Amino acid sequence: MERNTPDPEPSERAVLLYGLQRTGSNYTRQLLLQNFQHLCFCNQGYSRCLPTHKHFRLYDEKSAIPDVRFYNNFRYSSFQDFREHAGEIAGRGINIFIIVVKDPYSWYLSYKRHARKNKYPYFKGSLNAHYLIDYNLFYRKWLDFSMEAPEEVILLRYEDLIEDLDASLGRICEKFSLQRSSGALENPSKVNMNREFTRARSAYYKEKKYLELISERDRHVMQHLLDPELISGLNYQIIR
C-alpha cells in the first residue's frame, strides 16, 4: 500500500483531518500547517475506501454512500475502535481528529457543482437528496464521536474560520495544547485548484448570500430532509 505520509519527528503531533468534499478541508489543513508547529497530517496517500482518507464515509449505512469511489465495509462500535484501526493503517497512534463542517445550504450548492464536474451521480433539475442524506450521516457519526471523545475530536465550522480566524485557531490551540508558529497569523488566500478567497467570497458566507441561490421548492425539501438534531448540534439552522 502506497504511503505518502512522512515519518513524524518525535516532537510532532499526529493529526487526522476529515470533512466532506467542498467543506474547506484543504484550506483548513494549509491554515493549520502555517500557524502551528510540529503537526503531522496522516491523511495523505491512502485510498478513498480506507479510514485514513479525509473524505472517508465513517457511517454504518454504507448503501447511502453516493459515489462508488468511496464505498467501504468498515463499521466501528466505538470511537476507540475507529481510532485504533486508523492508527494501525497510519502506522502510529493518533489523538487529534479535526472535522471540518460547512453550513448545509452553502455546502449543497458547492457540492452540486463539484459532483457535476467529477461525474458523481447527479440529477439535473431536481434536488439531489442523496447528497443531503450523505451530509446527515457523515456528520451525525462525527458529532456522536465528538461527544464520546471530546478531548480528541473537534468539529470546526468553516464559517467560524471566516468570521474570526484568530479565535478559531485559539480554540484549537487550547484544546490540543498546540504550539503556535512565531510571527503574524497567516491565512492562505488560495489552496491547490480552489478559487482565490476574495472579499466577495467572504461576504457570500458572512451574509449568507448563498440562500438566495436556492429555490423555494428546494428549501422546502431540505427543511424536511436535513436532520434537525444534527443541524442544531452543529450550530446551524434549518431554513423554514
Language-model features: locations:
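PAPS-dependent sulfotransferase catalytic core
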Residues: 53-58, 185-240
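Short, surface-exposed acidic
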Residues: 41-44, 177-189
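Short, functionally important structural connectors and interaction interfaces within domains
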Residues: 15, 153-154, 206
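Short acidic alpha-helix initiation/capping motifs at coil-to-helix transition points
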Residues: 84-85, 162-167, 198-202
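PAPS-dependent sulfotransferase catalytic domain
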Residues: 1-183, 214, 218-219, 224-226, 233-236
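Glycine-centered secondary-structure boundary/capping sites
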Residues: 37-40, 93, 116-119, 160-162, ...
